[in-house]
Amino acid sequence: MSSSDSIRMVLIGPPGAGKGTQAPNLVERFHAAHLATGDMLRSQISKGTELGLQAKKIMDQGGLVSDDIMVNMIKDELTNNPACKNGFILDGFPRTIPQAEKLDNMLKERGTPLEKAVELKIDDELLVARITGRLIHPASGRSYHKLFNPPKEDMKDDVTGEPLVQRSDDNEDALKKRLGAYHDQTEPIVDFYKKTGIWADVDASQPPETVWSAILKALGKN
């Protein structure tokens, strides 16, 4: 890898694997930008940029935003977002081989090729237990877990005593469908990065601090 405190990587992992915990750690440690494709899309649309307007038109018609628009959005961030000076953590992209190839070509043209693709791996059954047990206090956003972090009183917020709710998309069948789709989509991407020699996997079933150490080790930064 290049200079000791820059980073150019893709973060891969299913819902609930801890990307939301680890991405901020990476941002803080490397002063790099966390480029989550959903956030980027929303930002470009709200700013009314040309790319944002193109994307909005497609989305309003129920279509999927093209690979070219997504790659150009990433290029735009790399060019105009000062936080990208020390590198980037791409999250949610690429999801297909053509996307991975287009991304690679664009990054190589800029002279900033990817250095690592880190996959957070976790057993589906464990993920389902993790996610379906999540309980939320809607007003404050405080979250609990039936198994790992239960409230003092069943289904009640510790601070206010108000009822807790379970997110509707956190139910088991919906989650298993999402995980099935995730694996179908991700396996070819993992193979692609294995072939290019930049892939590394991390066991995401461990406690967050252990996962963090393993990510740094995978990046050669421990």
UniProtKB/Swiss-Prot annotation:
It catalyses: AMP + ATP = 2 ADP. Keywords: ATP-binding, Cytoplasm, Kinase, Mitochondrion, Nucleotide-binding, Transferase. Gene3D superfamilies: P-loop containing nucleotide triphosphate hydrolases. The keyword Transcription regulation does not apply. AMP binds at residues 37, 42, 63-65, 92-95, 99, 167, 178. The keyword ATP-binding applies. It comes from the Eukaryota. It holds the Pfam family ADK. Its main location: cytoplasm. ATP binds at residues 16-21, 134, 143-144, 206. GO terms for biological process: ADP biosynthetic process; AMP metabolic process; ATP metabolic process; DNA replication initiation; pre-replicative complex assembly. It is found in: Cytoplasm, Cytosol; Mitochondrion intermembrane space. Its EC number is 2.7.4.3. Residues 36-65 are annotated as: NMP. Catalyzes the reversible transfer of the terminal phosphate group between ATP and AMP. Plays an important role in cellular energy homeostasis and in adenine nucleotide metabolism. Adenylate kinase activity is critical for regulation of the phosphate utilization and the AMP de novo biosynthesis pathways. Monomer. PANTHER family: NUCLEOTIDE KINASE (PTHR23359). Consists of three domains, a large central CORE domain and two small peripheral domains, NMPbind and LID, which undergo movements during catalysis. The LID domain closes over the site of phosphoryl transfer upon ATP binding. Assembling and dissambling the active center during each catalytic cycle provides an effective means to prevent ATP hydrolysis. This is Adenylate kinase. It comes from Candida glabrata (strain ATCC 2001 / BCRC 20586 / JCM 3761 / NBRC 0622 / NRRL Y-65 / CBS 138).
